[in-house]
Amino acid sequence: MIQKELLEQYGAIEKRYGKSDVIFEVNTNAHYYYQIISGEVKMNNYNEEGKEFIQGFFKAGESFGEPPLFVNRLYPANAIATEDSVILVIKKDFFKELLLEHPKEALSIIENLAQRLHYKATMAAEIASEDPEHRVLQLIDYSINHFNLSKDENGYLVDFTRQQIGDLTGLRVETVIRAVKSLEKKRMLKIINRKVYREV
């Protein structure tokens, strides 16, 4: 995450989005860098039948939609606020100027993009598996290892809804629910007050 004060020095402003507000749409030009102060954003696509495919969820402290800024391409997905959100927005040219003058921040962006590429490559291979339980568990374990899920005496809290797990693994919600219950019986997951925990 780039420090808020530094972004503001280069002209970043705060913008507020309500739940379900569209931040940008697929196949539109990329003019800004976005970094979330509070709230949550999802990036998605829809196929010809109208089925939604989730590219990812982004939370406070995270940025999204950067790749087209560097290759002068159109956005490959939509960005939509999933809850009321406050987002720092800075024009592309000012953002690039910041990166040129602050190499540590540039390296941070590169590492962030590399992390996402690794995630997509890993999950693409796992989603090829036909076993729903395997898909769900791999998503959870990857998130534990790379996204700093919170941990308490019950294990790691899985900070995804059943719908989000389904969207990220290509499974129907009903299939996710059955898989989670089966994994609970196998003592690989815990369900406490409707929250899912990964056993440690």
Model segments located where?
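ATP/adenylate-binding site constellation spanning eukaryotic-like Ser/Thr protein kinases
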Residues: 38, 60, 84, 92, ...
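Short amphipathic alpha-helical elements of helix-turn-helix/winged-helix folds
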Residues: 139-143
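Cyclic nucleotide-binding regulatory domains
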Residues: 19-83
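Short proline/glycine- and basic residue-enriched helix-capping loop/turn segments at helix->loop/beta transitions
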Residues: 1-19
